[in-house]
């Protein structure tokens, strides 16, 4: 396991910062042009004069996978020249490496090779072991690495191969069909043999009897094993034996005489320190019986009977005075892990937090079993019973990182992450750890993008972070994942709703570059698809409302997105929504906010100059004076009155914003002058009169649901001396914002030279008195704000 998550002295959780060497690798991995360039054939090659020693080459491959994307042949080509590059230890996971790339690597006379989830390597490349295996000391062929097996999952025909790697010390095979001619006798140095999920068929473990240094034998999910036990008992030097299985549902792992079988193993393998019998019944039922004290019909000695009384696992009676260092009892029959007297220093099981975390540590490369362990962790966190949070978090992140392609692992891990993160102070997670959690979630969601459960878990966990600040480092990738959730999942489903909520949050409070990216990815057209669907069905829901809010955000000070809105028949959808859902105040507020952004773009304003649009905008000026009807269903008259008052206040708040935005749209249109007013009715003068009348009805202390990043569009209207009514709206907007939110907006007025512009307005002869009065309010408010800052300082 990685064990990177640390519990800091202040109680926070974080990861160790990158070392200087790791930072250098990160820089190199993100900028391959430092050492390479594209050749005439389009492939990347090392630059002339570049020579990379072994330490750098091994570290580069390791860190490229850590900091970048899975390795492919294009990167491996950097190591074609074995005179200028040198590889010894290669660990590949989730790589798209082909057989050609693998040969490039193996020509380096590797010391260790590990392949996991490398789907592109086929059995046709197994000859590479014969050609280049002489130097190998460690060979690990994990899940989906088909070098010695056929890719078809149900294919049980063995590949005819021999292990022509005479110096192997460690061999890991996963799911390989072992043929009876397979030889091991020549592997004199072999000490660690892992045959997880291998099919023995006619192969006998007696072939291992001639290995003088074999100390570890892993037979996880290998069955049937009962007929191989005598061969195992002959491996007297074993220190570690694993005969566990992931599930006993098919009858495997169930022994006729479990106590005697385990006792036989203990009698013969006296050097064992690590034993795993998870999933089996070898721990017995915990009850002493006459039969359980007999081995092959022979009575146990009085000494053995005395030892038996000290353990609840009869077959381990001989180890009560010499306990095992590790014992795997995960999902054993009769809940062996919950017994009291277990002769082992460390136990993997599901009885408590310590056993679960131990299981996660030992089973880190067994995705099916590890998924169950994560489910156990999930239940611990769900009921807030987990104390060793930093270890648990490290376990989950490591599991998800190692088994990216294993969907159920990602689903289980993301659910556990949600409960780890949920409800905890954001400051308790350091920046490095936060980034790791978010990156791991995005990796899983991206890999399993079509699975709604994975998306739901990921989205929910992301809502626990501070948006958009915490995700800016992965902003573009997250947007793509959210767009999929919005457009490719069930209409009105939970995944779609939470995806559009997050998308809207990310569209807010980001800079212009990110808003441009949103537009380029098709956010506007995606929102139109959602809106069109609901208009067709005459359905109003939160997705419809948030879709307009999202477009409001992405068009803010982003002219090209405003154009995308108009080009996508945005005004047509606006009118249809207005007519179909006339009483939806939130919807109307969002739509008019968006049109306010469009109206700020001078070269787009002519498209708003139609009689129909202007009449609608003028009518919406009077939104604040509309009547309101609120139905009451409360039994209490007092409750009904309060409900009416609250609804009325909310209605007035939303209608004020509609009126304000409508006036803003008209002010910008009118600022282009009388010649640009190309319609006869309503007349420009009539609309401006109505706009001023609306402004005079507004409360200068009204709160706002808006975020101005710049006052440039408003200040441009302050300079519009040809049309004082436009200035009226502009100075009122500044006065309102600086009165209600002085800390934020007084500073913005000053930064954008607003005080000088307002003073010029006051000195000018054109604006009428009310405009100048409001302008003075803004200046006075900003002056008082500056004085407060001096006093506070």
From Swiss-Prot:
Q: What is this protein called?
A: Protein zer-1 homolog
Q: Where are the LRR repeats?
A: 84-108, 187-210, 269-294
An example Pfam family from this entry, by short name, is ZER1-like_2nd
The record's section on Gene3D superfamilies has:
Leucine-rich Repeat Variant, Ribonuclease Inhibitor
What are the annotated GO cellular component locations? Cul2-RING ubiquitin ligase complex
Instruction: Enumerate the SUPFAM superfamilies for this protein.
Output: ARM repeat, RNI-like
Q: What keywords appear on the UniProt entry? A: Leucine-rich repeat, Repeat, Ubl conjugation pathway
The record lists the lineage as: Eukaryota, Metazoa, Ecdysozoa, Arthropoda, Hexapoda
Species the sequence originates in: Drosophila melanogaster (Fruit fly)
What does the UniProt record say this protein does? Answer: Serves as substrate adapter subunit in an E3 ubiquitin ligase complex CG12084-cul-2-elongin BC. Targets substrates bearing N-terminal glycine degrons for proteasomal degradation.
- So what family is this one in? Belongs to the zyg-11 family.
